[in-house]
């Protein structure tokens, strides 16, 4: 993952390394792009220590910056791996459309000038549920040789008083996939695309055929499923 010094992973590794006196490497359930939030990221790490899980959690929260918190810590079986054992992930994208955004939520909600048609977006989203090749809705480069087939089990779009929530649950996601998927649905909501155009976009395998990559601040990894 390159230089992790100024990442959440890097901050935790630094504290654990000082605590144990040896190098520490964390295995996270998945990466999040810069600016994307994680409410319930999961990670595992192997360390040598006499401290209890509770003591480790308290030590981490004492030294971590205020915008990072360890909400649970427990000893796990030897073969547990946060990423390899994960069955799926739940992402939520929050968007304020056509109104005055909540200034206190500006770091967590994307402000969008145009009012969006939720019904049209829901019809489009129905075409994306299931197992498909999502290469067109990802930022993977042409040299990417691994499979770009992924399974989305659920997409829910809910209008709330001051925002629209897009909830996307799937077994795994490609680089920028959720943000591009939402960007494509938003263009449907704007009337720029037809709801039934989704299959053709997927079949094209062409990033240029899909919508914009939405800003990162509206996206949160809500849950890792096991």
Residue ranges and their predicted role:
Residues 1-226:
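Structured-RNA-binding interfaces characteristic of tRNA pseudouridine synthases
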